[in-house]
Amino acid sequence: MKKAVITGATGSIGHALIDKLLREGVDVTVLYHKGSPRISTIPDGEHIKKIPCSLDEMKSLIPNENDYDVFYHLAWAGTTGATRDDADLQLKNIEYALDAVELAKKMGCRKFIGTGSQAEYGLSDKPLTPDTPTFPFTGYGMAKLAAGQLTKLKCRKLGIDFSWVRILSVYGKYDPEKSVIKSAIDKFTHNERAGFSKGEQLWDFLNAKDAANALYLIGCDSEHNESVYCLGSGKSAPLREYIETIHKLCKSRSEIDFGAVPYSKNQVMFLQADISALTNDTGFIPTIGFEDGIKELLD
């Protein structure tokens, strides 16, 4: 891989992926949402280009170059709150994903990598595999599932290799402020009382740098086409333990109130990835433990 395109690059995974690609000598082009306040966090440099192109503009974008290798489509509108069940918005996301495949073809890419979600599965009491039955209960999960299926067909038609990566819970420096880990760190570093659910749910957290390494390895792989992968650490622990670890590392005096926040409707109580297919195909193995990942965020 010599040249790559990324949409949705301003989140934790996107930032980590840019850093990984640049370290590996890959030239990176970022397509970013016009007016994004976070684009300033993307580094400038000889080997990185930034092109303003919102999701609804990909269809009309005429690229100046057509010698790219891999297209990473991370961007998605409506990932939190009520927007997850906004049917019209989620339908547009499917269209945008198909537009991204068309753009990948125009840019000369040999491979399209789309990012899905554990939300495609709904509820499961076993580790998630590419073959685990999918029963999404949110509009977001339904749209991700449909986007994965339809972009595969579009890639097949256009002669582009395809991979769909169902991402579980990834954390990093550029997480939303309301994410569990980011909000816990904020409360604990300010020694404020922090309320959470009971924390009984078994959860799989992966550091953004490990996620970026997985996406890089998938991009380099030319042997496996139309592959679906689950991306996580492959291990799970009670959410309560993760929160207590953060509290300890912050050396916080905060009172933790487990049970202050009720479980949501259809609360996922078990989340763990089976990464064996990903490891077998690409050699990916997570290397950053949860404690080390949190320490890095605190430094």
Describe each model-derived feature in a short phrase.
Residues 53-92:
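NAD(P)H-binding glycine-rich loop region in Rossmannoid oxidoreductase-like domains
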Residues 208, 262-296:
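Conserved C-terminal active-site "lid" loop/helix of NAD(P)H-dependent oxidoreductases
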Residues 173-178, 200-212, 228-248, 288, ...:
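Substrate-binding strand-loop-helix patch
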Residues 123, 135-163, 189:
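Active-site Tyr-X1-5-Lys
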Residues 4-24:
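N-terminal Rossmann NAD(P)H-binding glycine-rich loop of SDR-like oxidoreductase domains
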Residues 73, 98-137:
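Conserved Rossmann-fold NAD(P)-dependent oxidoreductase catalytic core, especially the SDR/UDP-sugar
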Residues 145, 158, 163, 170-182, ...:
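Glycine/proline-rich active-site loop of Rossmann-fold NAD(P)-dependent oxidoreductases
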